[in-house]
């Protein structure tokens, strides 16, 4: 592991009770600062499971995960949460914006959870929303935004804590082709301009091909494309 390594997993395995076959079987991956990594695979191949393990949202059956040089297994749940919130951002296929809050408030929530003042959190959220092209939608509720705008707000929420790496699970899965390309353009621009590493799980081979490194998850293992 180099000083620039943000995420690393070694011989990662995951099995579930009642299943004879490992969902993940001996996966090793290193994510360095500023990298772009795409992971493709069929539905049920374990792509989301791998992303959850990398993000410390689930525990492996065997193997290890390190974030910023720290083994997740050696940390308490509270310590894992603190490290996760400091180093990682998450974007999902479903935006998970809270319908009762404005776009601005939704993006500010991670900062408020970290006990920043409301004014400071809203100020930072406004800056990030402007970066993703939603400066004119600050006071709109999620239901008043288009699908692409909601996903841009979700990207802004992932970025508001200044993460070193964004883990994106099918971030364009519910979008039409044109809107999906726009969201992907946004992620790549943020990677280029801010040096945020990207690990993107997607079923879209055309979008995956735009990333620096591409892997296919098949039979529990990662294969370089």
UniProtKB/Swiss-Prot annotation:
Family to which the UniProt record says this protein belongs: Belongs to the ABC transporter superfamily. Lipoprotein translocase (TC 3.A.1.125) family.
Cysteines paired by S-S bonds: none
KW Cell inner membrane (keyword) present: yes
Membrane topology recorded in Swiss-Prot or TrEMBL: Peripheral membrane protein
Taxonomic placement: Bacteria, Pseudomonadati, Pseudomonadota, Betaproteobacteria, Nitrosomonadales
Localisation: Cell inner membrane
Alphabetical UniProt keywords: ATP-binding, Cell inner membrane, Cell membrane, Membrane, Nucleotide-binding, Translocase, Transport
SMART domains, A to Z: AAA
KW Lyase (keyword) present: no
GO biological process, one term: lipoprotein localization to outer membrane
GO CC annotations on file: plasma membrane
Function recorded in the entry: Part of the ABC transporter complex LolCDE involved in the translocation of mature outer membrane-directed lipoproteins, from the inner membrane to the periplasmic chaperone, LolA. Responsible for the formation of the LolA-lipoprotein complex in an ATP-dependent manner.
UniProt name for this protein: Lipoprotein-releasing system ATP-binding protein LolD
MF-aspect GO terms: ATP binding; ATP hydrolysis activity; transmembrane transporter activity
Binding site for ATP: 41-48
EC number: 7.6.2.-
Oligomer and partners: The complex is composed of two ATP-binding proteins (LolD) and two transmembrane proteins (LolC and LolE).
Residues annotated as domain ABC transporter: 7-225
């Amino acid at each position: 592991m180099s000083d620039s390594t943000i995420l690393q997993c070694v011989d990662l395995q995951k099995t579930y009770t009642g299943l004879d076959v490992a969902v993940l079987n001996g996966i090793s991956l290193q994510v360095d600062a500023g990298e772009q990594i795409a992971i493709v695979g069929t539905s049920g191949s374990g792509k989301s499971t791998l992303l959850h393990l990398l993000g410390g949202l689930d525990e492996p059956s065997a193997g290890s995960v390190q974030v910023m040089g720290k083994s997740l297994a050696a940390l308490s749940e509270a310590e894992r949460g603190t490290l996760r919130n400091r180093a990682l951002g998450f974007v999902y296929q479903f935006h998970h914006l809270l319908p009762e809050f404005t776009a601005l408030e939704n993006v500010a929530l991670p900062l408020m959870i970290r006990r920043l003042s409301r004014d400071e959190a809203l100020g930072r959220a406004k800056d990030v929303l402007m970066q993703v092209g939603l400066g004119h939608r600050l006071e709109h509720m999620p239901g008043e935004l288009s699908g692409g705008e909601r996903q841009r707000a979700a990207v802004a929420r992932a970025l508001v804590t200044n993460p070193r790496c964004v883990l994106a699970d099918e971030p364009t899965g519910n979008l039409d082709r044109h809107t999906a390309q726009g969201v992907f353009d946004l992620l790549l621009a943020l990677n280029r301009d801010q040096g945020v590493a990207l690990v993107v799980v997607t079923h879209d081979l055309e979008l995956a091909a735009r990333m620096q490194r591409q892997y296919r998850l098949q039979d529990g293992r990662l294969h370089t494309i």
